[in-house]
Regions:
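Non-membrane alpha-helical segments in proteins
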Residues: 1-5, 33-45, 74-85, 123-130, ...
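Helix-coil-helix junctions within alpha-helical repeat/solenoid scaffolds
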Residues: 15-23, 60, 76, 91-103, ...
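Extended HEAT/HEAT-like alpha-solenoid repeat tracts in very large eukaryotic scaffold/adaptor proteins
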Residues: 117-121
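Short coil/turn and helix-start
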Residues: 6-10, 50, 108, 112, ...
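Flexible inter-repeat linkers and adjacent short helices
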Residues: 1-29
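A conserved hydrophobic secondary-structure block that centers on an alpha-helix together
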Residues: 43-49, 66
Length: 367
């Protein structure tokens, strides 16, 4: 049902609710973990972040009762993801690393994990690490997830692993092989008749083509339209932000899309891409003839503050670079250097990614 109707379809939610009532009547805690996971996905994809977190906590509580490592891995992973959704990056990573450690212990004992944890746990860890500013770690963990995805017999797990690897590439602005990744996602999702992941693949394809200057706008729009048809609201701010960030000729449609993303964040509490949307809005409004510079400065400051509060060092650096560039263009070179230098100095890896290169180039110009 999830593949054909979508994770967020009303029929899916109703089916899991019936299954949960039955498990509770029977006192079947083991099955409650699996049913709870279905409910968690239902709320996640609908961007019902509060409910998602509540169900994730229940899953972990059920898992502790079963004393099953597999269930505990699932519980820690779902709780980690729900924490990430609300912008609590470090707390999210702690839970995901517990899941990763349990998975490693399970493998050392020679026990096979019957779920998709070998793909999903490193996929999420890579995603979180990228936001936290650990680009090299993120790339290594991402590649591990892809290897696991390519070796699994579960095609649904495989397409998830490929999709999240593409997402991590977008966060790190590593677009070189994004088109090939998108094509692989589309092919596998089509084979599985899986509209949810086909939408991801189409959107990634459009983003890759836009970045390369080869059109792509329609492909991205078609992917987003298909995504909405599956009742999915999760990660819409991310998709809007990725689309806007590669546009070469922003328009009024650009600011409308950014605002829709910010409105969605306020409605859902899904805050992990909030800082980037404010930064992108700042980039757009800075060229407006009346009050553009002041509005841009405020948006860049807001983006930096949000990113700092979440521990999203990569987005904080990105916002600081935009703000420092604005200040330097208006005679505040000393302020710009003092803002950007300490933040750039925090980084110990990832010096080949676009964000660090841009920050380093600006600091050199400000020296």
């Amino acid at each position: 049902m999830t593949a054909s109707k979508g994770y967020a379809a009303p029929e899916t939610g109703q089916a899991y609710a019936r299954a949960r009532r039955l498990c509770e009547d029977l006192g079947d805690v083991t099955t409650l973990v699996r049913v709870g996971y279905g409910q968690y996905l239902y709320h996640l994809i609908r961007a019902e972040i509060g409910e998602c977190h509540r169900v994730a906590e229940e899953i972990l509580a059920f898992a502790e009762k079963t004393r099953s490592d597999e269930a505990r891995i699932l519980g820690c992973r779902t709780l980690g993801v729900s924490l990430f959704e609300s912008g609590q990056l470090e707390a999210a990573r702690v839970q995901l690393e517990v899941a990763s450690g349990l998975l490693k212990e399970q493998r050392q004992r020679g026990a096979a994990n019957r779920g998709d944890a070998g793909v999903t746990v490193p996929a999420w860890l890579a995603f979180v690490a990228a936001f936290q500013g650990y680009a090299d770690q993120a790339a290594r963990i991402r590649d591990l997830s892809v290897r696991e995805a390519n070796s699994t017999t579960s095609l649904h797990s495989r397409v998830f692993g490929l999709a999240f690897a593409a997402g991590t590439c977008c966060v790190l602005r590593q677009y070189d092989d994004l088109l090939a990744r998108a094509d692989a996602i589309c092919a596998l999702a089509t084979e599985l008749n899986f509209p949810f992941m086909l939408a991801w693949g189409m959107a990634f394809r459009g983003i890759a083509e836009l970045h390369a200057g080869a059109g792509g706008g329609q492909a991205a729009w078609d992917g987003l339209a298909l995504y909405r048809q599956t009742n999915s609201k999760w990660a819409l701010p991310f998709w809007f932000g990725c689309y806007v960030s590669v546009q070469r000729h922003p328009s009024d449609e650009t600011i409308s899309m950014i605002q829709e993303g910010l409105d969605a964040i306020e409605a859902t509490g899904e805050r992990w891409f909030e800082a980037e949307l404010y930064r992108l809005r700042g980039n757009f409004v800075r060229s407006l003839p009346r009050g553009g510079v002041k509005r841009a400065e405020q948006d860049f400051k807001t983006a930096k503050r949000i990113a700092a509060s979440q521990g999203a060092k990569l987005l904080e650096l990105r916002a600081a670079t935009s703000l420092a560039r604005l200040w330097s263009e208006h005679g505040r070179r000393k302020d710009a250097r003092e803002l950007l230098a300490p933040l750039y100095g925090w980084f110990r890896e990832g010096f080949d990614i676009t964000d660090l290169k841009e920050a380093r180039t600006l600091l050199t110009a400000l020296a």
